[in-house]
Every structure is written in structure tokens, then in C-alpha cells.
């Protein structure tokens, strides 16, 4: 018999055995499309827009279904009711994080994003308490964001209305806020170390969103035996970790346990308090990875939202005009915006929310994992199963947001023009793994966008109707196309 035929039969048998085990050997997975050997359902899922493929599959198989990304099953949960049931009602059972081969090489199970169990719980609890103590959502961090907003405005003023690519400067502002929280101070936008750090973070985010990295995570053998952009991520990560380690050493030399200056100091003090605990999760390794996580998550997500937001606003100049009218009426031109202004600026608040809804930055959430065998609806999902919760299915729900494919701040306004909250608005996810930096990110988006539109009118280089807002090919997140604009003084 032809060796190729034998190999094909063997692989098919292995796949059938795997499917049988999941159906009868400890779990009853939801239905889904029949997978191919080795590849699973990858060929049936459009890489260009995975969330759209999941929506189509939900119409066939219902709100809970199974796909195979490679040879391992992934349960997809689609729609508000099912997502809420999983992430909120059964929050503990769905609070695990799936371990991707590439991130495992980078983080080694440490940090806050891709850790699990006791380490994740303790690191997350510490991070939330520390950020809260330093004023997340309170006055002190608002001061830092306002300071950075003023620096951002001055940097934009230096362009003198000439066309520019906003990618770097819109990344520098949120990155500097993170620096002020974990390193105590911000950097000048021309600082070479800062420029290098920004470059590595931006490059990593782009690579992580590439189809190649998705292939590497589904077929780990590619990581060790083939060249590719995944190696660039590993090299960039070494640079970022070394940079962070130098900052930690500087803090160790000047630490005053009675007067913590920033996040690093607080972590070092916690390490000292637990130095006799052999099982302590507060180690230098965990600190380095946690800081790298905070940098990556806290910089690129906010930066991309700002960049995408300005592109959408330029395509809808009537929205810019309404926001600027509200800014003029509530704030004026002689003081900086503050968070107290938000409650008196419903249209601006609605616009910020609509930007986040429309861009749908992380359409399929960061994949979770079950922490135990879970009975979910009529299925039994085995411990350790990958779970994808579709945020698209809520942010683009046509009953909650009529004409969801249209950018319209009215989605968040009631009939009287007051701001309208929506339970379907979950760009930061929900439940036990909700984004740690949600409060900070909301503050940055409101203050940065308001400060920009208070001082400038973004002007495209093409007719607004010709602006293309279609995202580039994306994996984890949706990235806007590159563009240039002019910041015309208002």
C-alpha cells in the first residue's frame, strides 16, 4: 500500500480516537463542523475575519459549538446570554488561561496575562490593590494622564499642521502613563531608550496579530524548527526583559520600604515580606514578566484604539463637530479636560464608547481554559479545554445596537440625548479575567481624545468618504490601516 495512504489512514484514526475520547471519555463537547486530519477546521475558518466565521457557525450549530484549531478542540461561546453564563455565572470554572506554545516560551507561566491557578490569583490581586492604592480611578493617576495629555498636545503642535503618521506619538502617550505608574517617571518623546522600547512593543503587537503566529500556536513544531517572525518576538522579549531588569536593579538599590514610589517598589516590599515563604509567588522572575505584561497590554491596546478612533472620526467629520461643540460648551479652551467633565459630556462619552464598540479591538477575547470538568448547558467540557468567547457577538448585536455596522455615537444615547449604558458593551471582557487596566484605559481614552479635539481638528489627506477603515488582517486584535493626517489647530 502507498505510504502516503497509510499515513493518511493513521492520522484519520488518531483524529477519530481523539473525537471519541472527547465525546465519551470524560467529556461531551458541543457539536461543530467535522475537522480534517491534522489541520482540524482551519481551512473552514476564514483567517481574514475569524469572528465572522464564528458568527456563521453559530447560525448552524447554536451559541455553543466546537472547532478544531489543529488537532485540539476549542469551544466557542457566542451571544450575550451564553457568554454571561460562562464568564460571570460560572466565572471560576472558566477563569483559566489556555497556554499557547509561543507565549509559554516567553512568559514561562509567570505574569498576569498567561498565568494560572494560585500564581495568577495572587499576582492579579496584588496588581489590582497596588494600582488602586496609587490612585487608579482616583486623583493621583488622573494627574499623570492629564500631564501626559498636555505633553501629547504640545508634541502634536510641533507638527505645525503638516501631514504625519500618528502611530508613534499615539503609542508614546499611553506608554508613558504606564512608565509613570511602574517606574515613577515619564520619558521625553525623543529619549532613545524610550524609542527602542516603543519600537519593540509595536513590532511584537503586529507580529502577534499575524496568521503565521496563529499557525505557530496551533502547530508548535514550527516554532523550534522553522525561521519566521516568531523568532523576532523572542528576541524583542529578551530586550524588554533586560530593560525591565535594569529598572528593577535601580529600584533595589534605592528602595525605602516605608516610602514606596511605584509598582516596582511595592512588589519588592512584598518580596521582602515573603522572603521566608518557599512557595511565594513574589519573585524577580514573576515581577519581570508582570511588568512586561503591563507594558504590552497597557500600551498597544490603548494606542491602537486612539489611532483607530481618529481614523473613524475623520471619516465622520459631523461627529468631530458635535464633540468639539460639547467641549467648547463644557470645558472651554483655557483648562485641561478632567474626568469630572465626562458626566456633563454625554455625546463625547458616547463617541468614545462607540469607537471601542465599532473597532471591536479583541473580537474573540483572549482565549480562556476550563479549570475543571464543567457542565455547561447540556455539555460536559473537560478540564483544560480551550474556550473562545465572542465579544463580536455582543458588540455587534443588532437588537442592542441597531445597524451595528454603522459608526454612530447614538448607539449610546437615549431619546433625550443622555448617555445610555449597555450590558453588551464588553470590550474589556468580563468576569474574573476582566482587564486589570480597564479603569485606566477608559480614563486615557476620554482625556487623550478630548484634549486632542479641544486643540485640533484632525484632517485627512483624502476625501472623508474615501477613507478606508477596514482593519488589516488580524489574529488576536484588529489593527487599523496605516494612514497620515494633519492636526489643524482648532
UniProtKB/Swiss-Prot annotation:
Q: Note the topology in the membrane.
A: Peripheral membrane protein
> What up-regulates or down-regulates this gene?
By phenobarbital.
Cellular localisation: Endoplasmic reticulum membrane; Microsome membrane
Catalysed reactions, as listed in the record: an organic molecule + reduced [NADPH--hemoprotein reductase] + O2 = an alcohol + oxidized [NADPH--hemoprotein reductase] + H2O + H(+)
Gene Ontology BP term (one):
xenobiotic metabolic process
Q: Which gene encodes it?
A: CYP2C1
Q: Which GO terms describe its molecular function?
A: heme binding; iron ion binding; oxidoreductase activity, acting on paired donors, with incorporation or reduction of molecular oxygen, reduced flavin or flavoprotein as one donor, and incorporation of one atom of oxygen
Kindly list the positions annotated as binding heme: 435
Primary localization class, coarse: endoplasmic reticulum
Any Pfam family from its record, for instance, is: p450
Q: Which UniProt keywords apply?
A: Endoplasmic reticulum, Heme, Iron, Membrane, Metal-binding, Microsome, Monooxygenase, Oxidoreductase
A GO cellular component entry from the record: endoplasmic reticulum membrane
Q: What is this protein called?
A: Cytochrome P450 2C1
Q: What is its EC number?
A: 1.14.14.1
Enzyme class, UniProt record, top EC level:
oxidoreductase
What does this protein's UniProt record list under function? Cytochromes P450 are a group of heme-thiolate monooxygenases. In liver microsomes, this enzyme is involved in an NADPH-dependent electron transport pathway. It oxidizes a variety of structurally unrelated compounds, including steroids, fatty acids, and xenobiotics.
Q: Which protein family is it in?
A: Belongs to the cytochrome P450 family.
Species this protein is from: Oryctolagus cuniculus
> What cofactor does this protein call for?
heme
Amino acid at each position: 500500500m502507498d505510504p502516503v495512504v497509510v499515513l493518511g489512514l493513521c492520522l484519520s484514526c488518531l483524529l477519530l480516537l481523539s473525537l471519541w475520547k472527547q465525546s465519551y471519555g470524560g467529556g461531551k463537547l458541543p457539536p461543530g463542523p467535522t475537522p480534517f486530519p491534522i489541520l482540524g477546521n482551519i481551512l473552514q475558518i476564514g483567517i481574514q475575519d475569524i469572528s465572522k466565521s464564528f458568527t456563521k457557525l453559530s447560525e448552524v450549530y447554536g451559541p455553543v459549538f466546537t472547532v478544531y484549531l489543529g488537532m485540539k478542540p476549542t469551544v466557542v461561546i457566542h451571544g450575550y446570554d451564553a457568554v454571561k453564563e460562562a464568564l460571570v455565572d460560572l466565572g471560576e470554572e472558566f477563569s483559566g488561561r489556555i497556554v499557547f506554545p509561543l507565549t509559554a516560551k516567553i512568559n514561562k507561566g509567570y505574569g498576569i496575562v498567561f498565568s494560572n491557578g494560585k500564581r495568577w490569583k495572587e499576582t492579579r490581586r496584588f496588581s489590582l490593590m497596588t494600582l488602586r492604592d496609587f490612585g487608579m480611578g482616583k486623583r493621583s493617576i488622573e494627574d499623570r494622564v492629564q500631564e501626559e495629555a498636555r505633553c501629547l498636545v504640545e508634541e502634536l503642535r510641533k507638527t505645525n499642521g503638516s501631514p504625519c503618521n500618528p502611530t508613534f506619538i499615539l503609542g508614546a502617550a499611553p506608554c508613558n502613563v504606564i512608565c509613570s505608574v511602574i517606574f515613577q517617571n515619564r520619558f521625553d518623546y525623543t529619549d532613545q531608550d524610550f524609542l527602542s522600547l516603543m519600537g519593540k512593543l509595536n513590532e511584537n503587537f503586529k507580529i502577534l496579530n499575524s496568521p503565521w503566529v496563529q499557525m505557530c500556536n496551533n502547530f508548535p513544531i514550527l516554532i523550534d524548527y522553522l525561521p519566521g517572525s516568531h523568532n523576532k518576538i523572542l528576541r524583542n522579549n529578551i530586550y524588554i526583559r533586560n530593560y525591565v531588569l535594569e529598572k528593577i536593579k535601580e529600584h533595589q538599590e534605592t528602595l525605602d520600604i516605608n516610602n514606596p514610589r511605584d509598582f516596582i517598589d511595592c512588589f519588592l516590599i512584598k518580596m521582602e515580606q515573603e522572603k521566608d515563604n518557599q512557595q511565594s509567588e513574589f519573585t524577580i522572575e514573576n515581577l519581570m514578566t508582570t511588568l512586561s505584561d503591563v507594558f504590552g497590554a497597557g500600551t498597544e491596546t490603548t494606542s491602537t484604539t486612539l489611532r483607530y478612533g481618529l481614523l473613524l472620526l475623520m471619516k465622520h467629520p459631523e461627529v468631530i463637530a458635535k464633540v468639539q461643540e460639547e467641549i467648547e460648551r463644557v470645558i472651554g479652551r483655557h483648562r485641561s479636560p478632567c474626568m469630572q467633565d465626562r458626566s456633563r459630556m454625554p455625546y463625547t462619552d458616547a463617541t468614545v464608547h462607540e469607537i471601542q464598540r465599532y473597532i471591536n479591538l479583541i473580537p474573540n477575547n483572549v482565549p480562556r481554559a476550563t479549570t475543571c470538568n464543567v457542565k455547561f448547558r447540556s455539555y460536559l467540557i473537560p478540564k483544560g479545554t480551550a474556550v473562545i468567547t465572542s465579544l463580536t457577538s455582543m458588540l455587534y448585536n443588532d437588537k442592542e445596537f441597531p445597524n451595528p455596522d454603522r459608526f454612530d455615537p447614538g448607539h449610546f444615547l437615549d431619546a433625550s440625548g443622555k448617555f445610555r449604558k449597555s450590558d453588551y458593551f464588553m470590550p474589556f471582557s468580563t468576569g474574573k479575567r476582566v482587564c486589570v487596566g480597564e479603569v485606566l484605559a477608559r480614563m486615557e481614552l476620554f482625556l487623550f481624545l478630548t484634549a486632542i479635539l479641544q486643540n485640533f481638528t484632525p484632517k485627512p489627506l483624502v476625501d472623508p468618504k474615501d477613507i478606508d477603515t477596514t482593519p488589516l488582517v488580524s489574529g488576536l486584535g484588529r489593527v487599523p490601516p496605516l494612514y497620515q493626517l494633519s492636526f489643524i489647530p482648532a
